[in-house]
């Protein structure tokens, strides 16, 4: 890749980070997709054409899922839109190329009983157990993303006032209410946490045995372990607790706009998926009780 292209990609990364306010993971994925396209196609950013674009996308279609293809298209379209914005191009070679249709995937959720079983499976006689219980209660009680839980700071948690300040995608802040179970688990863990704290991550809530912040993989493995101990065989992840949080709120009548705010969704359309999950509940009720079921 020549110096000019490297400079363009560096500027594009800055644009995504600063002007678009995208999350670091999304920025990395977009830049990686664009760099791969330019490298493999041999096209120059200023001269890339639609024919070469279609050829490249066709070559990638067999190796990528529909969802990954859609993200690739989104990254490339965003890149060339930015070049037009900068005055470096007059057209977007992605125009007229359709993104693959993605079926709306309904996320797996846990029942209230399954949530309770997982919570009860944690060994609270050990500091690590108190920490794990606090993580689980905050994932489910506050609907946090795993990345948000791992980067949560003590100075962002206000148990007496009953809320958590969350730094979400694109460094956007939101306030989320903190229920009694989450507050109790948090304060219980905090009483043993200083034994593991190091200066580097002194304000981070959830620490590993070395005193450093827990990684997303560590939380993922902990969630899987506790699910198995609770006798739950379905495949779950930390995100399942977030989905369950939102679904249970909607099922119990919470306003969709409120749920949107608590999840940190930019668009209400993203949150609306939980109305489809709730529809399974009332559909089952209708089929069970209707005389012509």
What do the PLM-derived regions correspond to, one by one?
Residues 1-293:
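Conserved catalytic core of the tyrosine transesterase superfamily
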């Amino acid at each position: 890749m020549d110096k000019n292209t490297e400079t363009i990609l560096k500027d594009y990364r800055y644009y995504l980070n600063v002007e678009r306010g995208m999350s670091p993971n999304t920025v990395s994925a977009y830049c990686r997709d664009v760099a791969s396209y330019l490298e493999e196609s041999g096209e120059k950013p200023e001269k890339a054409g639609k024919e070469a674009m279609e050829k490249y996308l066709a070559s990638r279609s067999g190796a990528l899922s529909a969802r990954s293809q859609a993200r690739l298209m989104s990254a490339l379209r965003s890149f060339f839109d930015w070049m037009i914005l900068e005055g470096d191009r007059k057209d977007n070679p992605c125009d007229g190329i359709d993104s693959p249709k993605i079926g709306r995937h309904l996320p797996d959720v846990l029942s209230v009983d399954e949530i309770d079983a997982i919570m009860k499976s944690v060994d609270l006689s050990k500091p690590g157990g108190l920490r794990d219980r606090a993580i689980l209660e905050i994932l489910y009680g506050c609907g946090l993303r795993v990345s948000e839980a791992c980067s949560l700071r003590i100075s962002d948690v206000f148990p007496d006032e009953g809320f958590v300040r969350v730094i979400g995608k694109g460094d956007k802040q939101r306030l989320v209410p903190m229920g009694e179970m989450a507050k109790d688990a948090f304060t219980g863990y905090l009483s043993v946490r200083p034994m593991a704290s190091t200066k580097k991550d002194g304000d981070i809530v959830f620490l590993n045995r070395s005193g450093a912040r827990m990684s997303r993989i560590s939380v993922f493995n902990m969630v899987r372990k506790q699910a198995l101990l609770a006798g739950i065989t379905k495949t779950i992840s930390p995100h399942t607790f977030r989905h369950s949080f939102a679904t249970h709120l909607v099922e119990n009548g919470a306003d969709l706009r409120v749920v949107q705010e608590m999840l940190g969704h930019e668009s209400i359309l993203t949150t609306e998926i939980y109305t489809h999950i709730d529809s399974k509940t009332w559909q089952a009720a209708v089929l069970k009780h209707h005389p012509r079921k």
